[in-house]
């Protein structure tokens, strides 16, 4: 009986039961050494809000303006999937009605060329190109570790930068 009670007590103290949480929400795990879903969500929302509120898209006609997605360069110590940032941004921009993101896959590009040929039109090039960079700054003082991730984004048109912004997310751990 004692062994059974001890086993029940030990198993009751820890649980491997999984539970669903909101991705990037308040119950998500936070790590200093990793860009978490909450970081991706915060960076994307901040950059999109900054872009849309800046008025940088107002001068482009007709709406929605075509935009291509260039490289998002990873300059962190992690192997990260930059699509976690760029895809959230392009979804929000497409949904805003101000921007239409041009597909970069070969099949879509060939289809666009074919439709232009059949309709005796030229293939229209994107007026905007979105590029970016993610860098990190690491610091440690008296046993406290801190990392700041800097998410930089730019829009260019005809070789000129028409908008740029950055979002910094800093995290600490003892």
Q: Which residue ranges define each predicted feature?
A:
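Bacterial Sec signal peptide processing site at the extreme N-terminus
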Residues: 7-33
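Acidic/histidine-rich, surface-exposed loop or edge segments in extracytoplasmic proteins
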Residues: 23-35, 65-75
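Structured loop/turn residues at beta-strand edges in well-structured enzyme cores
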Residues: 8, 123-127
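N-terminal segment of the mature soluble domain
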Residues: 45-117, 121-122, 160-164
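Amphipathic beta-strand/beta-sheet edge segments enriched in Tyr/Trp
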Residues: 14-19, 127-173
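Solvent-exposed, acidic/flexible segments
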Residues: 33-44, 78-86, 142-146
């Amino acid at each position: 009986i004692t062994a059974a009670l001890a086993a029940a007590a030990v198993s009751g103290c820890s649980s491997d039961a999984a539970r669903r949480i909101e991705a990037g929400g308040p119950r998500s795990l936070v790590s200093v050494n990793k860009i978490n879903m909450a970081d991706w969500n915060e960076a994307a929302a901040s950059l999109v809000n900054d872009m849309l509120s800046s008025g940088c898209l107002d001068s482009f006609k007709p709406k929605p303006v075509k935009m291509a997605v260039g490289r998002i360069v990873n300059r962190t110590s992690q192997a990260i999937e930059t699509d976690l940032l760029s895809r959230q941004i392009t979804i929000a921009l497409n949904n805003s009605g101000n921007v239409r993101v041009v597909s970069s896959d070969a099949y879509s590009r060939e289809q666009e060329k074919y439709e232009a040929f059949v309709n005796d039109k030229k293939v229209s090039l994107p007026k905007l190109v979105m590029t970016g960079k993610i860098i990190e700054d690491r610091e440690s003082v008296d046993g406290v570790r801190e990392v700041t991730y800097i998410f930089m984004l730019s829009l260019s048109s005809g070789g000129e930068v028409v908008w740029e912004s950055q979002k910094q997310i800093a995290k600490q751990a003892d």
